[in-house]
Structure formats: C-alpha cells, structure tokens
C-alpha cells in the first residue's frame, strides 16, 4: 500500500471514517513511521479520534484533537497545533475530517499549504449500507458537497461497507458493484478495502490491499469516563 505524506479521510456520518483514520495511523506506526493524527471533526461529538488516545499513545502516534474534546463543552475548537500536520514534513500526517459539508469547512484553512506541498491523498470513506449514501449517485453528491465546503478534491475511495458486528465476507463482496459504479462516477481509484480481521482473512485476493481494522471504542462505550464527561443521553 503506497503512502502519501498527508492522508485525509472524509465521508458521511456513520461511514466509519474515524475508525479508518485511527487504524491507518496505527498501520503506519507499525511500519516504523513517525505519525501524527488530527481530529478536525468539530461537528459530531459522538465518534471521536480522542476516544482512541490510549491506544494511539501506546503505538507512539501523536494525537491532536479539538480543544475540550471528551468534555461537556458543546462546541470544541481546533488547536493551533493542528497546523503541524501541514508544516512538519518529517511526519506522516492523518486528518479525520468532519462528516458532511459543515464538518469539512474546518479543513479549508489548511488547503493552501496542502496544495503547495502536493503530497496528499484525500480519501472518501464509502459504506453502501448507510442511509443517504445507499446509491453511488447519492455518494457522489455527498463527495461534491464536502469538496465544495473544504476546497479540496477527493483523490481516492476506500470501501468500508459494513453492517457492524453482523458483517461477513459476503457483506463486503456484495458491495463490489456499488464501489465499482462509485469509482466510475467519481473517476477515482479504489485505494483499499477495510474490514475487521475475521472478515479480512476470508476475502479473496481481488480485494487487496486490505486495511485490517480494530474497532475503535466510542465515547459512550468507554468503561470509565473522565470527570466532567457526560453520557450520550445526557
């Protein structure tokens, strides 16, 4: 799997982009690379890169998350440290972008530096089983909205089609025609297929390269909460 210096993951809510971003960061770290990941999603508080802080730290991955992430503050703000991802070219940088056009606005401030370096991959995380992107045509509309909001074009697609814990190899294989059509409509290559290890080992060779996933804990799944945190229903 070829790596760019900067990789950005974006997609509609529920596409699994945060889990993809975290696992990609861990994969790069396993290759011995210096990795920094930033959570630029300041819209959706329920799926956050910061929830994987412990596993990222253990792997040696630097995490930059919105100020007040994992607290009871409703409107987190991007820290100044996030500029490191576009200025420090000695690290492999990963950006977890907001889940729709509103969330993608935060990326706009970094676009001039990204284009100047021109060593990036912006990946659309596709899941054909999610509402609002059940057809390739709907997914292309979401892609266009995100591109218009942030000022950067997608370069690749990753197939993250899944049904959560009910996902099997057949679930992924059934998404093949959808992903092929999406690739044609968007005129973009498929960067990779992602799947949990138990599913990935059952997929035929044509689905390579495969990003093998470990499920990221979500804020409301964590066994313990820091003082000041609130549950999902709070």
Protein language model features and the residues they cover:
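Switch II (G3) loop of P-loop NTPases
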Residues: 66-71, 90-106
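Conserved catalytic-core segment of NTP-binding enzymes
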Residues: 101-206
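Long hydrophobic alpha-helical segments typical of transmembrane helices together
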Residues: 185-234
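Hydrophobic positions on the alpha1 helix immediately C-terminal to the Walker A/P-loop
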Residues: 20, 24
């Amino acid at each position: 799997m070829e790596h760019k210096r900067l990789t950005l993951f974006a997609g509609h809510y529920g596409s699994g982009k945060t889990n993809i971003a975290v696992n990609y960061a861990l994969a790069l770290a396993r290759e011995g690379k210096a990795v920094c990941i930033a959570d630029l999603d300041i819209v959706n508080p329920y799926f956050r890169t910061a929830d994987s802080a412990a596993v990222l730290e253990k792997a040696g991955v630097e995490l930059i998350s919105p100020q007040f992430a994992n607290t009871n503050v409703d409107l987190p703000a991007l820290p100044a440290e996030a500029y490191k991802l576009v200025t420090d070219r000695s690290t492999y940088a990963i950006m977890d972008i907001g889940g729709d056009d509103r969330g993608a606005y935060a990326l706009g401030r970094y676009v001039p530096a990204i284009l100047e370096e021109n060593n990036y991959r912006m990946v659309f995380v596709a899941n054909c089983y999610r509402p609002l992107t059940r057809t390739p045509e709907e997914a292309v509309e979401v892609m266009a909205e995100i591109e218009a909001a942030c000022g950067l074009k997608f370069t690749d697609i990753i197939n993250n089609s899944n049904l959560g814990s009910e996902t099997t190899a057949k679930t992924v294989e059934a998404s093949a025609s959808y992903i092929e059509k999406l690739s044609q409509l968007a005129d973009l290559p498929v960067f990779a297929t992602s799947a949990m290890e138990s599913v990935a080992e059952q997929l035929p060779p044509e689905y390579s390269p495969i990003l093998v996933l470990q499920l990221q804990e979500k804020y409301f799944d964590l066994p313990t909460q820091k003082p000041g945190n609130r549950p999902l229903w709070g």
